Design a protein with these regions (language model features):
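Classical eukaryotic N-terminal signal peptides for Sec-dependent ER targeting/secretion
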Residues: 1-9
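Alpha-helical metal-binding/catalytic segments enriched in His/Glu/Asp
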Residues: 70, 107-110, 116-156, 248-254, ...
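Active-site-adjacent substrate-binding region
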Residues: 57, 73-77, 89, 188-244, ...
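Zn-dependent metallopeptidase/amidohydrolase metal-coordination segment
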Residues: 55-58, 62, 73-76, 108-109, ...
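N-terminal hydrophobic or amphipathic helices/low-complexity stretches enriched
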Residues: 13-82, 311-312
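Acidic/histidine-rich catalytic neighborhood of metal-dependent amide-processing enzymes
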Residues: 114-116, 120-238, 284-311, 315-323, ...
Length: 446
């Protein structure tokens, strides 16, 4: 997949993001100065399309064309989109503020896609960020703090099994940086070999050079489709994310005794499959009993050995995902699941050969000032809005480790995501870009 990085590089190079020189007059057209952005009288500062005479407008038609064009850079036929990791680097673009020595305000998302997915996940937050900054440029607005766009690599865990790989590294993932030196994909191609083949490799010991220090940005804001049905079902334009739930991933293995399905009587069985089934129900019970609707649990993988209809399972493998916005509550549920696994193994005379937590990231909380800026922007645009929890991984989860963070959601059709039917309307995208633009503008003046 050598051509879609070139397309995006062209898009960045053809988009005039470095717009404000250090000798510009900082009193000219700040947020308080340009027409169309009344801080005290919130009338709509935007036109409904780029053809309006409003000083700050979003070119929704051009943005949709870019989304459609980027969707053609895929390993699978349309309408599905497949874009898998090609580099460990992240692409950045910057518009200088009139006080460039201040820490910048950043925005961005990812453009990689799992196999046979849609064309809006992540892409709206990247191309929308470019259009948001261009809208500010067209208005004459000049930021105090510089504005940066980050294109994160490998947000999806498709190739090397690690989600948000780029943002994890930026946030100082020392353990990950070390592990990547020897990590291989399903075709036994190492991470470093894959990076070299794409022309982006660094030295083997140089991955730590991408680490960013805490407070490298004054704020990070990500625009994203909701990936759920709430906004569309309730007819709400904008979701203001207050928390990002983080999952813990658990691998469980039971070992029993196999045998012929007709030859071993029920009282004499040590069925690893039934132990797994009982644990699956225990996961549901513990999650439902957490006391919060924000706790969710999923058994996404169940494998039985030998996997024959007339054979008693001698081995069972499960992989469990537990998520919550409260880390202590999530971890308490995991402890209960572990205790249940041990009790079930004892009860059914099977062995609990593995209960391993393979990933346990902390949740993240949006910064109050970013929530307030996003809400104010939505009000000024007269858009309906609601506070929301994100239960999906996003790069913002890891950016929160080094920067104040916030997220903006827009509706998507029936909540579909990670499938070809994924869709966000041009109007909803336009609304999201407008809110992002105003939010960035507000934060740039802080």
């Amino acid at each position: 997949m050598s051509r879609y990085p070139l397309f995006f590089l062209f898009l960045l190079c053809s988009t005039p993001l470095i717009l404000t020189q250090h000798n510009d007059d900082p009193t000219l057209k700040t947020m308080h100065g340009f027409s169309g952005y009344p801080l005290d009288e919130p009338s709509n500062p935007f036109g409904s399309s780029a053809s309006d005479s409003s000083p700050l407008s979003v070119d929704a038609q051009a943005l949709q064309k870019q989304i459609d064009e980027l969707s053609t850079f895929s390993d699978t036929p349309a309408p599905s989109v497949t874009r898998i990791l090609y580099t460990e680097n992240d692409v950045l673009a910057r518009r200088d503020g009139y006080e460039p020595e201040l820490t910048a305000v950043a925005t961005g998302s990812h453009i990689d896609a799992i196999p046979y997915s849609g064309k809006y996940d992540g892409v709206v937050g990247v191309l929308g960020a470019i259009e948001a900054i261009n809208a500010l440029k067209r208005s004459g607005f000049k930021p105090k703090r510089s504005l940066e766009i980050i294109l994160f690599t490998s947000e999806e865990p498709t190739r090397f099994g690690i989600g948000c790989l780029g943002s994890r590294l930026l946030a100082g993932g020392e353990t990950l940086a070390e592990a990547l030196k020897t990590m291989v994909d399903g075709q036994n191609i190492s991470f470093l070999e894959a990076a070299r083949s794409a022309g982006y490799a660094r030295g083997e010991d140089d991955l730590s050079s991408v680490f960013l220090k805490k407070d490298s940005y004054s704020a990070f804001v990500e625009l994203h489709i909701e990936q759920g049905p709430i906004l569309e079902d309730e007819g709400i334009s904008i979701g203001i994310v207050t928390n990002i739930a983080a999952p813990a991933s658990i691998k469980v293995d039971f070992e029993g005794n196999g045998g012929h399905a007709g030859g071993v009587l029920m009282p004499d069985r040590n069925d690893a499959g039934l132990a797994a089934a009982e644990l699956m129900l225990a996961v549901e019970n513990h999650v439902m009993g957490s006391g919060s609707i924000d706790t969710v649990g999923t058994v996404g993988i169940l494998e039985l050995h030998p996997g024959a209809i007339n054979s008693i399972p001698s081995k069972a493998h499960l992989e469990i995902d537990v998520r919550d916005i409260d880390e202590d509550r999530r971890n308490a549920v995991i402890k209960k699941i572990h205790n249940s696994a041990k009790a079930i193994a004892k009860k059914r005379y099977v062995t609990l050969s593995e209960f391993k937590i393979i990933n346990q990231d902390p949740p993240a909380h949006s910064e109050k000032s970013i929530i307030e800026a996003t809400e104010a922007a939505s009000k000024e645009l007269k858009l309906t809005r609601k506070y929301m929890v994100s239960r999906a991984y996003h790069d913002s989860l890891f950016m929160a480790r080094i920067s104040p963070m916030g997220m903006i959601f827009i509706p998507c059709y029936k909540g579909y995501s990670h499938k070809p039917e994924e869709y966000a309307s041009p109007k909803d995208i336009e609304n999201g870009v407008k809110v992002l633009a105003l939010t960035l503008a507000k934060l740039s003046l802080s």
